[in-house]
Design a protein with these regions (language model features):
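Extended, highly charged
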Residues: 1-256, 261-440
Length: 440
């Protein structure tokens, strides 16, 4: 959907995104005129599983299998001499982040945040390239924060560099084929190669060119690349920031990223991810689903599919199984809760559509009894931004990990043959019905 009218990147652009979300409309948006920049802004690329499927030229139910297969059968990048990302090169005194239409999303955000950038850095241990999305607050025309969660690969790489007393060269890629952002959500070992996963998703190698000011290759066909280094001897306050929990994350120290160059296409399009919108949650949840599905498949042979719904802010997982024995639902819920830091796992039968929150709620209300179907696991590690998490050591201790009580719900029907059948017209009739024959 084209937005031809002029919009301000400070709140107004995100207000359009929010209003459409409230109206249950999630089109890909291109804002053609953004105050203060010549670049258009595109958003909502990952607003739903359907969007992800379109990007990967598949169907929604095949997104996760395709993603996990690409992680196993990666295709390494290839080096080329040049590419469109070199059309415009801003280095030295010409470096100015203000040329980019970086958006301020929420009323109390600390400032404009780069929310879609895929940061590429080299792992000093393996020598391989690592890619991940981290949030970046603009602190000056030449500096950003680099806010990385404590357990992510980027944070580990920076910590290793800090011990060795050197900085980390990095490149922030803003805008490329959606497969790059999708691949960056890969969870697992630090040695895993996200750029190889992207190649497998595209069925061709990712073209890379040498950066201008750092010793790294960067994607040749990117819209924008911000080159620089992550300081390992200096920190800056980052926040407040509207996060995927849909609350403000409080200010916390983050590493400083010093910009040494900005390169971009002549007709570059800036990609923005609405930080408190479905796009953030859908993309973020993709990585969880990939790793959890792979782990659960080994523990739950009758697993059919999983879904991390947007409504759960990354803390809820639906698990669909082909139940053969009573008790399998509880076992599947325990396995799901152990596979990731979900606060709640709901297990349903194969006749329940896990991509429809209403159908899952229906199963919970008609196939469970609280004293038999629901269990709790106290004292489990939870996300550092959980507003209900409690410190492990003592109240108010900022260094303590946050803990939570996890909830498992077995919403599968008992195998007792006396349990009633679902009432509906003949399933084969309505599932294969061509409505065009009846509706005009």
């Amino acid at each position: 959907m084209q937005v031809p009218g002029e919009v301000n990147p400070r709140w107004e652009l995100s207000a359009v995104q929010k209003r459409l979300e409230v109206d249950r409309r999630l089109p890909v948006l291109q804002f053609q005129k953004v105050v203060g920049s010549t670049m258009p802004v595109i958003s909502n690329l990952f607003a739903s599983k359907t969007h992800l499927a379109l990007a990967l030229e598949t169907t929604p139910e095949k997104v996760i299998p395709r993603f996990t297969d690409a992680q196993v059968n990666g295709l390494a990048p290839r080096n080329v001499k040049s590419g469109p990302v070199k059309d415009v090169v801003l280095a030295g005194d010409n470096v100015d982040l203000n040329v980019l239409p970086i958006v301020t999303h929420c009323e109390k955000d600390a400032g404009p945040y780069l929310s879609s950038g895929v940061t590429i850095m080299r792992d000093p241990v393996s020598g391989s390239l690592n890619a991940g999305i981290y949030r970046n607050l603009v602190t000056s025309p030449t500096t950003l924060t680099m806010n990385m969660a404590p357990l992510c690969h980027g944070s580990e790489i920076a910590a290793d560099a800090e011990k060795a007393k050197h900085h980390v060269e990095a490149a922030i890629v803003v805008g490329h084929h959606p497969a790059l952002a999708i691949s960056s959500q890969q969870r697992g070992q630090r040695s895993e190669l996200e750029l190889n996963t992207m190649g497998a998703l595209l069925e061709e190698p990712l073209d890379m060119v040498p950066a201008e000011t750092i010793d790294l290759p960067v994607p040749a066909d990117a819209e924008i690349v911000i080159e620089g280094r992550i300081r390992t001897d200096a920190w800056a306050d980052d926040g407040p920031f509207g996060d995927y929990w849909l609350y403000y994350a409080p200010p916390k120290p983050a590493r400083i990223f010093e910009v040494t160059a900005i390169t971009h296409r002549r007709d570059a399009i800036f990609h923005d991810i609405f930080s408190v919108g479905p796009e953030h949650l859908t993309l973020f949840s993709l990585g969880m689903e990939g790793v959890v599905f792979s782990q659960l498949k080994q523990l739950v042979p009758d697993l059919i599919a999983i879904n991390v719904p947007v409504c759960g802010s990354g803390n809820l997982v639906y698990v669909q199984i082909r139940k053969g024995l009573d008790g399998q639902g509880v076992n599947a819920a325990i396995a799901a809760l152990g596979a990731y830091r979900f606060k709640c796992a709901v297990v349903v039968d194969e006749d329940v559509d896990i991509n429809d929150d209403g159908k899952v709620l229906w199963a919970m209300m008609t196939r469970t009894q609280a004293d038999r179907s629901i269990f709790m696991i106290p004292g489990s590690y939870v996300s550092r931004v959980d507003p209900t998490g409690y410190p492990a050591w003592q109240t108010g201790n900022e260094g303590a990990p946050l803990l939570s009580t996890r909830l498992g719900i077995d919403a599968t029907k008992p195998l007792d043959p006396a349990f009633p059948e679902v009432a509906e017209p003949p399933r084969e009739l309505w599932t294969n019905l061509d409505l065009k024959r009846y509706l005009k």
